[in-house]
Amino acid sequence: MRVSRLMLVTLRDVPADAEIASHQLLLRGGYIRRVTSGIYAYLPLMWRVLRKITAIVQEEMDATGALETLLPQLQPAELWRRSGRWQGYTAGEGLMFHLEDRQGRELGLGPTHEEVITSLAGDLLRSYRQLPVTLYQIQSKFRDEIRPRFGLMRGREFIMKDAYSFHACEADLAMTYTAMDEAYQRIFSRCGLETVAVEADSGAIGGASSQEFMVTADAGEDLILISGDGLYAANQEKAVSHPPKAIPLLASKAALLDTPEQGTIETLCTAQGLVPSQVVKVLVMLARIEDGELQPVLVSIRGDQQLNEVKLINALSRELNKGVLDVAPISADQISAQKLEAWPFGAMGPDLDDALLSEATSWTKHFLRLADPTATELNCFVCGANQNNQHRIGMTWSKLGEVPKSVDLRKSQAGDRCIHDSSQILEERRGIEVGHIFQLGRKYSEALEACFTNDKGTQEPFWMGCYGIGISRLAQAAVEQHHDEAGMNWPLAIAPFEVIIVVANIQDEVQQKLAEQLYSELQAADIEVLLDDRNERAGVKFKDADLIGIPWRIVVGRDAAKGQVELIQRSSRKVEILSATQAFTALVQEIAANQNTRV
């Protein structure tokens, strides 16, 4: 390919709306262009990258025995209602684009395909003899992100590989889950990425267990917690750990404390000579349930700890046996809108009276009460007195009455001691999620009544797994992990081209002839080569070559008359002066050495 025919348009200035390096470089390098918020066009260079990633994914999926298919992007609402996900995905801040057809039938533009594939499996897979089966597809997905950002990292349209497996038993599901884990490790390794597999929350997809694959990068949206010995890694949403030990509060008689202008843990402790681990703080949250119910929740947690809202959502879902869409702190304005009397914010205790909710217009009229073990394990503590500007000291749970149900709700932090070995300390890293695998169990097959006949002749629901990779996100994550101040530095396996030839002076016939010779020889050797034949200054071409990040560069310049060229490796910046023949041989050998990563 010749640059003069590539429609390459590079930018010198950083686009104002691009916040992170990878987004900036993809725009500046002519790989993508923004069409509207969260929607991008993949230009020729980017499309070559995406095709290479796709081919690697297809090879590894096919090697597991998975079958490629293509499912409809438009999906009937009826399937999603049967699974219980329509309301959560379309109401309020739901992520699904949805519409009505001419007959008034509701449809959703697929953010994921569990419902459709489960329905098809129920029709097509009748007997245990047909199992296991894994189906996968690679296509565009759509999510109506509230705040699209970071380019392809969090867009409203993106390319994804999603696979779904169907099994006769849980043990068989576990085997496929392990096989997919291994396939994902190979995919990311072949793509030249450093990834970490971490325990993860299953989120809106659901299921018994899941694992995320993170590309480590400072700009990552996710916080990963990893043990020093490398034996434990989890997304912070999922992580568990031992909290720091509390500093005991000496037992004393219960007494009231006047605490004016001490409505935060910090101001209370400063004024009263306390430390946060001696205080039980109370958070009032509102849970939005999938059936439309609004449930006030009262959470007790030790004063030095932070609430993990994902853990709270999961705990509430188990407690209510219903899907919980989200939780958020209750505000004074919301209380007023419910026609309720003001609550004593900053001075609430675990025994806050349900009577405060008796006149609520649309909320459930009682608190659902939960407490983190960091709170329930305190023998003596300070807490709010349920009156403005007053707290209680010398309190115990027996003095308060009923102890709330104890469940892990705290957010693990770097510095916490590890569960598997308390001598190990959690460390934090940032990561970009590029893959996620789930053991779904029977959640969807039961909801959609997708069954097979087992070896005893009776009907039972499938055991299911699902396995996703963000193809377009992976491409940008590669840039985030592999770039420098001059531009991108693509791993060889997914680079749009393997070699770029830069002719310093296209008007020089000797340079042009030698460049054309190398171009033809490299093409004949099945090496993907880009020839910069533009009539531009050499400095412009060199800057563009650095920016677009092709792994190897041949510069044909003044030494062309001696048959010599510069061979430059983009990643190391190593420069060698070689004969054209030596440069050709070196490239053939180098690319052959990486043959296992090529498609």
UniProtKB/Swiss-Prot annotation:
Record key words, sorted: Aminoacyl-tRNA synthetase, ATP-binding, Cytoplasm, Ligase, Nucleotide-binding, Protein biosynthesis
GO cellular component, one term: cytosol
InterPro entries: aa-tRNA-synt_IIb, aa-tRNA-synth_II, aa-tRNA-synth_II/BPL/LPL, Anticodon-bd, Anticodon-bd_dom_sf, Pro-tRNA-ligase_IIa, Pro-tRNA-synth_IIa_bac-type, Pro-tRNA-Synthase_IIa_type1
Keyword ATP-binding appears in the UniProt entry: yes
A biological-process GO annotation: prolyl-tRNA aminoacylation
Superkingdom of origin organism: Bacteria
SUPFAM superfamilies: Class II aaRS ABD-related, Class II aaRS and biotin synthetases, YbaK/ProRS associated domain
GO MF entry, a single one: ATP binding
Family, similarity comment: Belongs to the class-II aminoacyl-tRNA synthetase family. ProS type 1 subfamily.
PANTHER family assigned: MITOCHONDRIAL RIBOSOME PROTEIN L39/PROLYL-TRNA LIGASE FAMILY MEMBER, PROLINE--TRNA LIGASE
Biological function: Catalyzes the attachment of proline to tRNA(Pro) in a two-step reaction: proline is first activated by ATP to form Pro-AMP and then transferred to the acceptor end of tRNA(Pro). As ProRS can inadvertently accommodate and process non-cognate amino acids such as alanine and cysteine, to avoid such errors it has two additional distinct editing activities against alanine. One activity is designated as 'pretransfer' editing and involves the tRNA(Pro)-independent hydrolysis of activated Ala-AMP.
Subunit organization: Homodimer.
NCBIfam families given in the database record: PRK09194.1, proS_fam_II
Entry's free-text remark on domains: Consists of three domains: the N-terminal catalytic domain, the editing domain and the C-terminal anticodon-binding domain.
Protein name from the UniProt record: Proline--tRNA ligase
Protein source organism: Prochlorococcus marinus (strain MIT 9303)
UniProt lineage: Bacteria, Bacillati, Cyanobacteriota, Cyanophyceae, Synechococcales
